[in-house]
């Protein structure tokens, strides 16, 4: 009965812990529905996100992007010279060449789309354009301590928006 009402039911203690954690983290966010936006810098991850939105205890769907969202994401990709490599859709593989700013701007575009109720963002810390690793003499100033890194800017973006954002770091 509760599943039919939209509740997620934990099948075991580990699942309960995960659901309890998510409930605590997302308690201030308003979830309007089950339409997901999925962004990743790796193709396998975006496919995995799409394949994992239906389970025994819940079902979501990939939200259809509004034309304005598609245009905005295309602009971002053009500015990053990734437009020839990336097709705008949901889920979207924004390519390992996408930098922190691209991750943030595309997340924001998805958050503003009325057909998206929640966003999942995958970040690959080993991608060459992302500031997500410890400081290194090989890339001075281009690490997670940089104030322009996703580590510092994503929490601000999440705080400004009512929709939930889930981050995945591979």
Where do the PLM segments sit?
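Catalytic-core regions built around general acid/base machinery
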Residues: 1, 146-161
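Conserved thiamine diphosphate
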Residues: 1-13
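Structural signature of the thiamine diphosphate
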Residues: 10-37, 108, 112-113
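Well-ordered alpha-helical segments embedded in enzymatic catalytic cores
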Residues: 15, 19, 102-106, 149-153
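A glycine-rich phosphate-binding loop feature that marks nucleotide/adenosyl-phosphate handling sites
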Residues: 15-20, 41, 124-126, 169
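Short beta-strand elements of ligand-binding domains
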Residues: 164-170
């Amino acid at each position: 009965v509760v599943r039919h009402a939209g509740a997620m039911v934990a099948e075991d203690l580990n699942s309960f812990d995960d659901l309890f954690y998510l409930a605590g983290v997302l308690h201030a966010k308003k979830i309007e529905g089950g339409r997901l936006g999925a962004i990743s810098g790796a193709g396998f991850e975006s496919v995995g996100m799409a394949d994992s939105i239906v389970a025994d205890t819940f079902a979501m769907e990939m939200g259809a992007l509004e034309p304005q969202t598609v245009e905005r994401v295309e602009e971002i990709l053009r500015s990053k010279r990734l437009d020839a490599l990336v097709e705008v859709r949901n889920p979207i593989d924004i390519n390992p060449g996408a930098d922190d700013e691209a991750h943030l701007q595309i997340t924001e575009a998805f958050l503003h789309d009325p057909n998206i109720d929640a966003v999942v963002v995958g970040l690959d810390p080993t991608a060459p354009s992302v500031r997500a690793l410890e400081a290194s003499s090989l890339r001075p100033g281009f690490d997670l301590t940089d104030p322009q890194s996703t580590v510092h800017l994503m929490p601000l973006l999440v705080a400004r928006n009512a929709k939930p954002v889930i981050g995945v770091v591979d």
